[in-house]
Amino acid sequence: MRDTPPALIRAALVGVSGYGRWHLLMAMEQALVGRLQFVGATVINQAEEAVICDRLRRQGVPVFGCFDEMLAALAGRVDLVLLPTGIQWHAPMTVAALAAGAHVLVEKPIAATLQEVDRIIAAQAAAQRLVAVGFQDLYVPAAHDIKRRVLAGERGTLRRVTVRAQWPRPEGYFSRNTWAGRLRTDGAWVLDSPVNNAFAHFLMLALFWAGAQPETAAEVVQLEAELYRAHVIESFDTVSLRARTADAVEILFYGSHAGCEERPPEIRITGDRGEITWIYEKAYTISRAGASLEEFAVPSQLDTRLSVLESLVARLRGEPAFIVGPELARAHTRMMNALHELFPINVIGQEHIEVAQETDGIFRRIRHLDSSLAEAARRNALFSETDAPWAIAGDAQSLDGYESFARCCPPSISVG
């Protein structure tokens, strides 16, 4: 960093709705313990958020209607900008905040494309500022204890990391903002999907735990993926993928917003002498030959989210703390870009879909998805390698030399 910010970090926030609520909570938590001063907020929907805006103003925090206006008004008086914004704004706002001399906490994913990530990396180097990315599960000690155990070979040579995530979402989930379920919005790539949004944390954990060094992610050299769409959206809502890393570790991912069963995301780390099983908000278990040896708690969602800004503020105050930087987060964006560029989105036929009106809204569900997903995860298979009638096999693709998004996506294909 170019210089050290004052002991009291002066922070500004962009957005207080949606995920912005969590960033507001994080900032207020750090302010309460005397480590952060809230100096400004950009809120474009001030009428809708009148209560929060009034509260901020009463606390002496100026509220702006425009991001650029806020940066200009706070020039030289802000150390950190929090960006819980839409994916399409991550890169331009991060670069602008860095140019204004501020450090940045940007929500995950870091950006939609590799080119944008590389712009952020270059801007960070020029500004000599920090950029932290909100992959919250990597900020807690549990993630690093697991990484230490993997690198130490406690369960033998690492063979496979398997992620299973099932969170059904109603139609309203995809209409909650201008970018949900979209490939492009506001003239920019967004590439929204389960693995670039709700499940991004868990794919990032898999890449991190498969990485060869304590603070690096795995390099994926080959990818095979099946993308499916049951909802009326541009992107996909269901996925199975198989990746191979440069160290010959297999990464498997199974996820959907279009099933019946809701279950906490689970990551299974398999070595040739045992496993580590991590379950979201519950525990991680160290086992050998199916017998549990040790079990440790996984922090709650609240504690995990609060740890992000806590870690960044500590780092800015010169204290040792881990943060997810752009170079680490880039591994996730690289996989997202390869998925969209190299594999088609298969549109599930209506004969394979059930539509149900429930208390939380209208749900579109792929028939027998839950059993197919469970079978695939059990057998380390893709959906097309089960008896799922809607599944379509694809070819494995090399990612050798894949370092930029070519700005074109394979067409959607209807599944009979």
Q: Which positions does each model-derived feature cover?
A:
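Glycine- and charged-residue-rich phosphate/anionic-cofactor binding loop of Rossmann-like
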Residues: L36-V39, E294, G318-A331
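N-terminal Rossmann-like dinucleotide-binding module
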Residues: M1-Q59
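Contiguous beta-strand/loop segments that form the cofactor/metal-binding neighborhood of enzyme cores
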Residues: N197-F322, M336-E341, Q350-G416
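Predominantly a Rossmann-like dinucleotide-binding segment in NAD(P)-dependent oxidoreductases
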Residues: L138-L223, R229-V232
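Short amphipathic alpha-helix with an adjacent loop that forms part of the alpha/beta core around
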Residues: F67-G76
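Short, Asp-centered acidic motifs that coordinate Mg2+ and/or phosphate
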Residues: G40, L80, R160
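Beta-strand-loop-alpha-helix segment that lines the small-molecule cofactor/substrate pocket
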Residues: L80, G86-I87, A91-L138, G153
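Short acidic-hydrophobic, aromatic-tinged amphipathic segments that line or gate anion-handling sites
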Residues: P62-C66
